[in-house]
Regions:
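A conserved mid-protein helix/loop that constitutes part of the nucleotide-sugar donor-binding site
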Residues: 19, 190, 197-213, 234, ...
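Short hydrophobic beta-strand element within catalytic cores of glycosyltransferases
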Residues: 294-297
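Carbohydrate-associated surface elements
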Residues: 154, 175
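Short His-centered aromatic/hydrophobic patch
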Residues: 101-107, 123
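Short, structured helix-loop element that forms part of the nucleotide-activated donor/catalytic region
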Residues: 49, 221-248, 260-261, 337
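Short alpha-helical donor nucleotide-sugar binding micro-motif in glycosyltransferases
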Residues: 256, 264-269
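Aromatic "clamp/platform" in nucleotide-sugar-dependent glycosyltransferases that forms part
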Residues: 277
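Conserved acidic donor-binding segment of nucleotide-sugar-dependent glycosyltransferases
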Residues: 309-310, 314-321, 330-335
């Protein structure tokens, strides 16, 4: 079986989807499923490069497509129009048994429509309101794939509401490398960790505001690349500077980090905080739990499917710095409870979200799709 995973951006671009695609491709290849990757040619800051190339990463063939038009609207996941994909790259698709599209960029599905191969659209975050309002985008979503993979049960309901048949939708949760993301060493008391794109939707500003309501001196580590909203990023840097000048807490922004550096902070942190306004099924929460780090997060997207309230973490309402502060204070004052939550979180991830278990399910999906369709 030969699989081509197609995604707008790929490693070394850092992000939840990019990490997921890379881990799946590596693990599938280890298990004897030949898997390669096709993506637009972007630098680490997602700026387009105008020339294509083919390279080997982790033993995987990566086809880099010239990014001839990269015009995001509403979200980095939904582009304005369809980016041009040269014919020589589309011809490459004929060499694979299944074309597995990641994210909701329609460039590759649109230009690959004539290729008679089984196709999957794998959504890592649904923008239900966008597709409900934009009829052409909704039409494309419904007709450019034979199967749809969603990462949360909530997302499955949203796809069905957009008119996609339930028997074409498969729920496959995100995964984590539980060998890499594993507990190690001692936790550092009062060390909080935020990992994610520095965007308004992730709610980092809420976390920074919450520190004013916490008694103990906090050390907050912030990791993640800036979003396209430069103003928000600059405001965050200003908030960090002002909080550090107050002297009651310490905040460090470290930028984007690769997995080998990132895991060290998960292992050290007392708590992982994600006060998002909206999510798909955040890999960062799985990474934290795999390292036995309890999570405080908001009940948005697929998060309630991961976090069992008061068992593996605490769920708090969005846009509520005081409520967040109370949850942080409660867990910092209860070390035994933190450790118990951490152990339960690791058990949960090992059972349901290890990369090995998820890849077994994905292989079964591939086999069923091939058996159900006849393609010449």
């Amino acid at each position: 079986m030969r699989i081509l995973m197609v995604t707008p951006c790929y490693y070394p671009v850092k992000g939840g989807t990019e990490t997921t695609v890379r881990n799946l491709a590596i693990t599938l290849n280890k298990n004897g499923i030949k898997t390669d990757v096709m993506a637009f040619n972007m630098d680490q800051n997602r700026k387009p490069r105008w020339r294509g190339k083919t390279e080997k990463i982790d033993g995987i063939t990566v086809y880099r497509i010239p990014a001839l038009r990269w015009l995001p609207i509403h979200s980095r996941r939904i582009t304005a129009g369809v980016n041009f994909v040269p014919g020589r790259f589309i011809d490459t698709l004929k060499n694979y048994d299944i074309i597995h599209f990641h994210e909701l960029d329609f460039s590759f599905p649109f230009f690959s429509f004539p290729i008679k191969k089984p196709k999957i659209i794998h959504s890592h975050g649904i923008f239900y309101d966008f597709f409900k309002m934009h009829h052409i985008s909704r039409f494309l979503l419904k007709h450019l794939a034979h199967l749809y993979i969603v990462i949360s049960k909530k997302m499955k309901k949203e796809f069905m509401a957009l008119g996609i048949s339930e028997n074409k939708i498969v729920h496959l949760p995100n995964s984590v490398d539980t060998d890499l993301f594993a507990p190690k060493g001692q936790k550092e008391d009062n060390l909080l960790l935020f990992v994610g794109r520095i965007s308004g939707g992730k709610g980092l500003h809420i976390l920074i505001k919450s520190l004013q309501h916490i008694k103990e001196r906090i050390r907050l580590i912030v990791i993640g690349p800036p979003d396209q909203n430069v103003n928000y990023f600059q405001n965050i840097l200003k908030m960090i500077e002002e909080e550090n000048q107050r002297g009651e807490h310490e905040i460090k922004y470290l930028g984007a980090k690769d997995q080998n550096e990132l895991v060290k902070w998960y292992q050290k942190a007392s708590l992982f905080i994600l006060p998002s306004f909206g999510e798909g099924f955040p890999v960062t929460v799985l990474e934290a739990l795999a390292c036995e780090t309890p999570v405080i997060a908001t009940p948005v997207g697929g998060i309630p499917e991961i976090i069992k309230n008061n068992e593996t973490g605490i769920l708090i309402s969005p846009n509520n710095p005081k409520s967040l502060a109370e949850a942080i204070q409660h867990l910092l004052e209860n070390k035994d409870l933190r450790y118990k939550m951490g152990r339960e979180g690791r058990k949960y991830v090992m059972k349901w979200h290890s990369i090995e278990n998820v890849c077994k399910k994905l292989c079964a999906i591939y086999e069923q799709l091939i058996d159900a369709n006849k393609f010449g």
